[in-house]
A protein has these predicted regions:
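Membrane-proximal, acidic/low-complexity disordered segments on the non-cytosolic side
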Residues: 55-83
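Ferredoxin-reductase
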Residues: 72-173, 229-231, 259-260
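Structural motif
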Residues: 193-195, 290
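Hydrophobic/small residue at the entry helix of a nucleotide-binding pocket
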Residues: 201-206, 299
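Histidine-anchored nucleotide/phosphate-binding helix
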Residues: 207-217
Length: 333
């Protein structure tokens, strides 16, 4: 290509220099018009060719220069949460999960993650009409390393001021959030096995832990989840849990329990009892097994005993006490 272009450039200069400057406007001497008639078409073609090849080379050079230029450095990932102050986050979208539970997706900057430890929660706040603040803890369910957004899965409780407030929010509204508040720090291969007993929205801290452990390819912890709900329609995050169980059959098992049998239900029904735990979680009580419990107060009372005052763990009671477990083996979210 270069061998062709150099002679072409010479030809263009030669032709352009021979074209009379005023040939286009005033009569010329006899015979001179032949030069103009022949010179203009050739000159136009040559100039066009010169422009084409010059442009092509210039374009290639520009493209090569762009390709060779170093990519702009990525912005470092930062944490959006502040443990000492409430930060307003804008609601991006809402996804209905069950008749009374929805996923609320909040916006972050592209290079921001929420800034959670696992397992941890945050506190949310809004002011009532009388100006009094309502503050409630919630556990985000999105991946701790996710950037650009984070999720809450929140069940609506009639008469519950915060849950009703969040369920009445529209995209563009903001919610004040502070944290994180560490609950039970999780480390790789910290336990040989973990038994989880959850009820209703008590699945959220369990899901956070399950997701964190299963994405760690170095971790070998076996996780057994017993998840109790009123009806099959009330099971929160079932699709996500089933997907994780299918992808990790040697590490994660889920048993769903509902209050009363329905026509097509094949799983266990009724309360989470000592017998049900022994049948579906035989690892309970074994060496280096930890039991996590989270659910509504009536379930907590019958399974593990309620938490103590000022957010302390309290004594182990109920079914887990009957199985010989103590505070050393059990953690209540």
């Amino acid at each position: 290509m270069l061998h062709l272009i150099n002679p072409l450039r010479t030809s263009v200069r030669s032709v352009v220099s021979t074209v009379p400057r005023r040939a286009y406007s005033t009569p010329t001497k006899s015979g001179s018009s032949k030069l103009v008639t022949v010179g203009l078409p050739f000159g136009a073609a040559a100039i066009a060719a010169y422009a084409y090849f010059s442009g092509s080379l210039g374009g290639a050079s520009t493209a090569e220069a762009k390709a060779a230029a170093p990519a702009a450095p990525k912005k470092p990932v930062t944490s959006a949460l502040d443990p000492n102050a409430f930060v307003d986050f804008k609601l991006k979208s809402v996804e209905k999960l069950t008749p009374n539970t929805s996923r609320f997706i909040f916006e972050l900057e592209d290079n921001q993650k929420l800034g959670l430890d696992v397992a941890s929660c945050v506190v949310t706040k809004f002011a009532k009409e009388d100006g009094k603040p309502v503050i409630r803890p919630y556990t985000p369910t999105s991946d701790a390393d996710l950037t650009g957004s984070f999720d809450f899965v929140i069940k609506r409780y009639e008469g519950g001021p915060m849950s009703m407030h969040v369920h009445n929010m529209k995209p563009g509204d903001v919610l004040a959030v502070k944290g994180p508040i560490s609950k039970y720090p999780i480390a790789t291969n910290q336990h040989e096995s973990i038994t989880m007993i959850a009820g209703g929205s008590g699945i959220t801290p369990m899901f956070q832990v399950v997701n964190e452990l299963l994405k760690d390819k170095e971790d070998k912890t076996k996780i057994n989840l017993i998840f109790a709900n009123v009806t099959p329609a009330d099971i929160i995050l079932k699709e996500e849990l089933d997907t994780l169980a299918k992808a990790n059959p040697d590490r994660f098992k889920v048993t769903y329990v509902i209050d009363k049998a329905v026509d097509d239900w094949t799983g266990p029904t009724g309360y989470v009892t000592t017998e049900l735990i022994k049948k579906h979680a035989p690892e309970v009580g074994s060496k280096n097994n930890k039991v996590f419990v989270c659910g509504p107060p009536p379930m907590m009372k019958t399974v593990s005993g309620t938490k103590g005052p000022n957010f302390t763990q309290g004594e182990v009671d109920g079914a887990l006490k009957e199985l010989g477990l103590t505070s050393e083996h059990v953690f209540k979210f």
